[in-house]
Amino acid sequence: MFKKMKRNVIITIIVLVLISLLLHFYMQTDSYRIYMALCEAKENKKQIKDALCFFERGSERWKAMRYLVMHMPSHTSYVNKGMVQTEIRDIEAISSNYIEKNVNEAYVIWKNCLWKHEVSFEKFCKYILPYKVDREPIVEWRMYFYHKYKHLIDSVAKEEEAYRIIYKYIKKNFKVKHTKSFGELDVLTLDSIQGGNCRERALYMTYVMRALGIAAVMDFTPFWANQGVNGHFWTSMVRSDNITYTISDNGEAYIDGTCEPYKYVVNKNEYLYHVDSLKRIAKVYRYSYDKVRDVSVEVAQNLPDIFRCAYSVDVTPQYRNVTKNNIIPIERKCEDPLYVCTYQQQYGWRPIGRANRVDCGHVDVGPMI
């Protein structure tokens, strides 16, 4: 009797373990993510289901649509209602017609690029297909920018060359200035203004490049490591080998805005210490479309601002001049969260990255520039 009970207990445990493993693996699948997205769509569920069924099952456009939907719950957009700007969840508000057009237009542009062999389907989904970058208002932008800028790169066969041409053109014509605007501006408004802060220029440039089939991303540093209280945004390109590419004369990852021109003639020989006008960067992040981390409302309340975004990813290692093996001794309780910080005159030390414990006495602050 006892042996039979023991055997039944063992069988029950094995069955439960197998069920747990199956559930765990299922929760990592695209089908589960699609199911969860439909659940979160609420009253907009029919629109999302219609979009998922729009393209032929198994086709690349069908897979592209699934990619957009499964990661959509992480994204929100601002909507202007009179003089009030409210934030809504894309999964609860976006129309099937909008995302169907977005997928179709992006796919056709990608397939007709002269450099399409440089852009894999995975790369297309991540860096060309998304209908947005951050939380800006949603508008129909892709074909407008395509027709406006396509003539600049009609005969260009290399993605890097197309990136350079568009980058230089927009940098010359879109003026960076400190402006006060009413909330988040959509990219068509930015197009009519042709001016804004560095974030708005990077946002605009990223949209234009994606409309032309260039795998563009918006990278940023939350704060300069040695100047002021602001950060900086710029547009990079992801090459076919997944290396971050920016314009450079010497082969190194160049970040615009890092050199502040001298206002006066400086004789460096008159100074005891090295003098330059370089703005230095500690960490670089990128707005992805993929969900990078789970950030619930409850968890977000206890996190520094930089870590509240579910789709920003640390890409510091993809830039040149990176220091590695930054392990330092520390005397803190093992359960305490640790952050990498930079110092700002007005605010003191502010978090800019996560630090990972090696053990209770050492911490790895991660790659830094």
Task: List each model region and its residues.
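Mixed-charge, low-complexity segments
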Residues: 5-66, 70, 262-369
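Compositionally biased, intrinsically disordered low-complexity regions enriched in proline and serine
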Residues: 27, 68, 79, 99, ...
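Hydrophobic/aromatic-rich core segments of domains that either
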Residues: 30, 35, 154-157, 162-164, ...
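Short flexible/disordered coil segments
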Residues: 94-100, 240-252, 305-306, 310-318, ...
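Hydrophobic transmembrane signal anchors and adjacent membrane-proximal interface regions, especially
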Residues: 44, 50-53, 67-70, 77-79, ...
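Secondary-structure boundary elements
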Residues: 32-34, 46-50, 55-193
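N-terminal secretory signal peptides that target proteins for export/translocation
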Residues: 1-3
